[in-house]
Amino acid sequence: MSRVAKSSITIPTSVEVIITGNLMSVKGRLGQLNMSIHPCVAIMNTNSKLSFDIITIEKKEQRKAWAQAGTARANTANLIQGVTEGWKKKLTLIGVGYRAKVMGKILDLTLGFSHPINYKFPEGIIVETPSQTEIIIKGMDKQKVGQVASEIRSYRPPEPYKGKGVRYIDEQVIHKETKKK
């Protein structure tokens, strides 16, 4: 039995959860998110608490079913936080001449290449640049926010000798020692 699926989720008063068949819809002050539910997972909504269980299946499939129930519970908690508070990732640019600026729906990155990089971010994502070397990515969908942050980081990941590149604000880069004669 999944330890994650055992714990129930308390639904805040500002959030509305609608379950129809294998689709869950979560509405909050920031918007609405949808998620499909695995057929072996049963979700009960009682007294503004969501509890997760599995639909009785064969003994050999129960382990996978509980894993799906735990995943559904974690994803539901992420949806609820997304529609109430939202998700945020911060990136920092380290290197001489590395800078970023937002122009409408395009993030313009100068990362030491011979050309600037224009990254068009998807719908539902807000990108801010409080300074030239800081990027803040906000949105309701945790997966989308993480994906956008990962794509921006992949243009120039931090290198291990000087640490130059795009990194998450809390990321620790392990430095290598240079070759000695």
Curated annotation (Swiss-Prot):
SUPFAM superfamilies, alphabetized: Ribosomal protein L6
Residue ranges the record marks as coiled coil: none
InterPro entries referenced in this protein's UniProt entry, alphabetically: Ribosomal_uL6-like, Ribosomal_uL6-like_a/b-dom_sf, Ribosomal_uL6_a/b-dom, Ribosomal_uL6_bac-type, Ribosomal_uL6_CS
Highest taxon above the source species: Bacteria
Pfam families: Ribosomal_L6
Gene3D superfamilies per UniProt: Ribosomal protein L6, alpha-beta domain
Keyword Plastid attached: no
Keyword vocabulary terms for this entry: Ribonucleoprotein, Ribosomal protein, RNA-binding, rRNA-binding
Single GO MF descriptor: rRNA binding
GO terms classed as biological process: cytoplasmic translation
Record-level GO cellular component terms: cytosolic large ribosomal subunit
Role, per record: This protein binds to the 23S rRNA, and is important in its secondary structure. It is located near the subunit interface in the base of the L7/L12 stalk, and near the tRNA binding site of the peptidyltransferase center.
Family the entry assigns: Belongs to the universal ribosomal protein uL6 family.
Oligomer status and interactors: Part of the 50S ribosomal subunit.
Name of the protein: Large ribosomal subunit protein uL6
Species, as recorded: Vesicomyosocius okutanii subsp. Calyptogena okutanii (strain HA)
Gene: rplF
